[in-house]
């Protein structure tokens, strides 16, 4: 169909392409549409399918030509992109540059369009690349902290017949009172639940209810300083009526051999549990170290390589990040986009961080594309077995899941990405930095 096509790269990873279609093909396509019109058109004095072409062209020539042009562009773009050197972004729509396209049967049909493509760049040798990684120290206190977390996770909530204390889980009603001690109904809240000393309640009355018992009511005077966490309450005074409706406490299990057995059936003693916790912590450190090493490598490469990120690619990534932020923080995306943190209001530092992370992703994808290794049937089988073990399912059921949803292609891509990642980490040299605690290291942001 396409007679010739010429392309040239432009700034912003845009590609300008000129497509030429032979006049013979154009005429054939025009006649095809004309025949279709003739077969369906009803004109007084003629039977359907017997209307002379000259009459149809005299009345519908502009429509037929417009339809022919639309068809030619659509089909030629499909053919062009099937073998295009510069692959288009799936979410970017090609833009026709010609203001007015016309068919001239004496000339080949030609049109020019621009589309955004995957960025073109090369990665130099990384064999001498080094990354700096902190040395992680797992202390006895770190292990004890993890044991406390396990105790907390395995605790149960029970009724407390005593008074409110730090750590109590309390259900309260509260309302603001005016100077005449009348309730300000707009501020009334019922069945509000907080953990005393832990929850961040709006009025900050958690410590004021310590000592209260179930069904007890109390009026509390609150004075808020200029630096109060909620600015609308800063430099104000409030009078609150608070009623305690329910008091519960967290029943923490004893740290003993029986608890170890409850955590994992194969553990018999508390010392076994400590060893188990240490092993898990070492695994977390290794996983985090690998993430940090890869993140530093990719960002380091991205800084040295000129990656011309297309605007539509960046906008799509920015929207994904904002959507993820909205989901994690339970913020309605419409409200978020209408606020100062919407796409137009996102600050430059945030955008720069998103852009840098996007470049790191592009660098890694380029490394995957450049890797010549293939995913074998054995690799695929091993991954299915691994997933089956993790999900406690039969391997054939996991295989059926991927087959029914036609997801084997995606699974193979993910396996290759993992193989490339392992190869990179195996060859990557690291320089140990200062020692850091386990908790500080786990809370460290990798930039991924």
Swiss-Prot record:
Main location: cytoplasm
Xref: SUPFAM superfamilies: FKBP-like, Triger factor/SurA peptide-binding domain-like, Trigger factor ribosome-binding domain
Pfam families reported in the protein's UniProt record: Trigger_C (PF05698), Trigger_N (PF05697)
Keyword terms of this UniProt record: Cell cycle, Cell division, Chaperone, Cytoplasm, Isomerase, Rotamase
Family: Belongs to the FKBP-type PPIase family. Tig subfamily.
Name assigned to this protein: Trigger factor
Free-text comment about domains: Consists of 3 domains; the N-terminus binds the ribosome, the middle domain has PPIase activity, while the C-terminus has intrinsic chaperone activity on its own.
Annotated Gene Ontology cellular component terms: cytoplasm
GO BP, sorted A to Z: cell division; protein folding; protein transport
Alphabetical list of HAMAP family matching this protein: Trigger_factor_Tig
InterPro entries attached to this UniProt entry: PPIase_dom_sf (IPR046357), Trig_fac (IPR005215), Trigger_fac_C (IPR008880), Trigger_fac_C_sf (IPR037041), Trigger_fac_ribosome-bd_bac (IPR008881), Trigger_fac_ribosome-bd_sf (IPR036611), Trigger_fact/SurA_dom_sf (IPR027304)
Domain PPIase FKBP-type: 167-253
EC primary class: isomerase
